[in-house]
Amino acid sequence: MAMTSAVKDELSRLSVTKTCCRRSEVSSLLRFAGGLHIVAGRVVVEAELDSGSSARRLRKEIHELFGHQSDVHVITSGGLRKGTRYVVRVVKDGEGLARQTGLLDPRGRPVRGLPAHVVSGGACDSESAWRGAFLAHGSLTEPGRSSSLEVTCPGPEAALALVGAARRLGIQAKSREVRGADRVVVRDGDAIGALLTRLGAHSSVLAWEERRMRREVRATANRLANFDDANLRRSARAAVAAAARVERALELLGPTAPDHLLVAGKLRLSHRQASLEELGQLAEPPMTKDAVAGRIRRLLAMADKRARELGLPDTESAVTAEMLEA
C-alpha cells in the first residue's frame, strides 16, 4: 500500500487556510475514523488512524478550531492487528465537540451521514470531506487493470453522502457493500487523478500518473508483441498449407501446367514459409504479392478441376490437421 501511505502523508501536511474547509475536514475525519462512546455517562469522541502525521494533524485542528484538548494513544501491531494505530481521544466535553463538528444534531442524536454544514457547503467543503475520509479510511491501489481509490465507510448513509460529495466535484464514485462493509470506490483512472488533485495530493498525482503511463506503455507493447506473434503463426501455417496444396496440384497437372503458373508454384515449394511479398521479390523478374497469389490461386483451381474430372482427391486433401496446428 505504498501509494496509500504516500497520499496520506502528503495530505496530512497540506496547508488549508479557509476555516470552513478545515472544519469540514475534521468533521469528516471524525465521522469516518471514529465514533462516539459513552464512558461513565459522558460522551467520548474517538478517531483511530493508521498514520501518525494524520493523528497529529487531527489533534492540532481540534485544538485550534474547536478549543478542545485531545490525547493520542499509540497501539502497536500484534496478533491479528497489522501496523501501528493511533487513537485520538477527546474525553473532556466530548459532547461539546460532537455538537460543534456535527456528529450530533441539535437534539443530541448521532448523525449517520455527513454533517449538514458539509453536505450543504460548497465545493471546498466536498473536497475537505473527501480529504478527511481518505485520511481516515482511504486506500489507493497501483495503476492497472483493477486500479481504484476506495474509502471504507461507517455506514450506508455516510457512503451515500461521500458519493454525493464526489458528484458535486464532477467525479463519479459508486457505493457498494463488500463483506459487510460499506465502501465508496472510484475506478476510472482519469477520475482518480482528478480527485487526488482536488484533495491537494499533487506530488502523489504525478507519481501515480507516471506509474499509470509506464504500465499502459508496457501493456500496449505486450499486446502488439502478442498480436505480431499471432499474425506470424497464422502466416506460417497458411504458407505451409499452401505449399502442400501446390505440391498436390503439380502432381495432378504434371507437364500440362502453364509455365507462368508452374514458376509461381515452384517458388512456393522452394520457400515454404516465405510470405507472398517475399516470394514476389524472389521471382525473375520480381512480381507483386498480388500477382504471386493470383498465379498460385489459378494453379490450384486448375488442379482441383482436373481432380474432379478424374475422380481423384483435390489439393485440399494434402492439407493435414497437423499443418494447421503447427
UniProtKB/Swiss-Prot annotation:
GO biological process: cell division; regulation of sporulation
Taxonomic superkingdom: Bacteria
Keywords: Cell cycle, Cell division, DNA-binding
Residues spanning the signal sequence: none
Gene Ontology MF term list: DNA binding
InterPro entries: Homing_endonucl, Sporu_reg_WhiA_N_dom, Sporulation_regulator_WhiA, Sporulation_regulator_WhiA_C, WhiA_LAGLIDADG_dom
DNA-binding region: 275-308
Pfam families on file: HTH_WhiA, LAGLIDADG_WhiA, WhiA_N
Similarity comment: Belongs to the WhiA family.
PANTHER family attached to this UniProt entry: CELL DIVISION PROTEIN WHIA-RELATED
Role, per record: Involved in cell division and chromosome segregation.
The protein's name in its UniProt record: Probable cell division protein WhiA
Species whose genome carries this gene: Saccharopolyspora erythraea (strain ATCC 11635 / DSM 40517 / JCM 4748 / NBRC 13426 / NCIMB 8594 / NRRL 2338)
